[in-house]
């Protein structure tokens, strides 16, 4: 598939997600990075977003809870080019009933070439990157070209 450029604005659209055992570590990270996160547009799955919004006093667009379809909603936003960065504190030691949704979410993040952090260290690397505060161009699949070639 051919690639095209997609321009990310200086204010990124950041998705925040955490499995149940990782909600407190994500909250602690968000509290530590709160002032920087305020510069961006924040999205989160339902339970995580509600908790972060209340505790960190941040404006967050909340989707459904992950097991109720929130991971899939987030995947759709990624595919539509409406999410720039995914911060996903997942629990590598415990399986969740919606593991297929989680795998699909991570797959879409890879397909659409968005940065993904699955732990605190990587999240810090992403937040400290100069590209988080400036416009940045990424290469993404040319879906319009793909569709045109498949339907001609």
Swiss-Prot record:
InterPro entries in UniProt? Methylgl_synth (IPR004363), Methylglyoxal_synth_AS (IPR018148), MGS-like_dom (IPR011607), MGS-like_dom_sf (IPR036914)
MGS-like domain location is 6-152
Question: Where on this chain does substrate bind?
Answer: 19, 23, 45-48, 65-66, 98
Keywords, ordered alphabetically: Lyase
UniProt GO cellular component terms = cytosol
Identify the PANTHER family for this entry: METHYLGLYOXAL SYNTHASE
Q: Which SMART domains match?
A: MGS
Q: Which domain of life is it from?
A: Bacteria
Q: What is its EC number?
A: 4.2.3.3
- GO MF, any single term: methylglyoxal synthase activity
Q: Which Pfam families match?
A: MGS
Task: Give the record's family classification.
Answer: Belongs to the methylglyoxal synthase family.
Q: Which organism's genome codes for this protein?
A: Aeromonas salmonicida (strain A449)
**What protein does this entry describe?**
Methylglyoxal synthase
Catalysed reaction(s) here are: dihydroxyacetone phosphate = methylglyoxal + phosphate
Transit peptide among the record's keywords?
A: no
Per its UniProt record, what SUPFAM superfamilies does this chain match?
Methylglyoxal synthase-like
């Amino acid at each position: 598939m051919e690639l095209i450029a997609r321009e990310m604005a200086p204010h990124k659209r950041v998705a925040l997600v955490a499995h149940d055992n990782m909600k407190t570590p994500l909250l602690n990270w968000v509290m530590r990075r709160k002032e920087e996160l305020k510069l961006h547009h924040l999205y989160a799955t339902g339970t995580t977003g509600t908790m972060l919004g209340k505790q960190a006093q941040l404006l967050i667009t909340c989707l459904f809870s992950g097991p109720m379809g929130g991971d899939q909603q987030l995947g759709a936003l990624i595919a539509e080019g409406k999410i720039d960065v995914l911060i996903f504190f997942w629990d590598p030691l415990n399986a969740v009933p919606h593991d297929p949704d989680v795998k699909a979410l991570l797959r879409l993040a890879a397909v659409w070439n968005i940065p993904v952090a699955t732990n605190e260290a990587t999240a810090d690397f992403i937040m400290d990157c100069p590209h988080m505060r400036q416009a940045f161009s990424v290469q993404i699949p040319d879906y319009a070209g793909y569709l045109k070639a498949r339907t001609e």
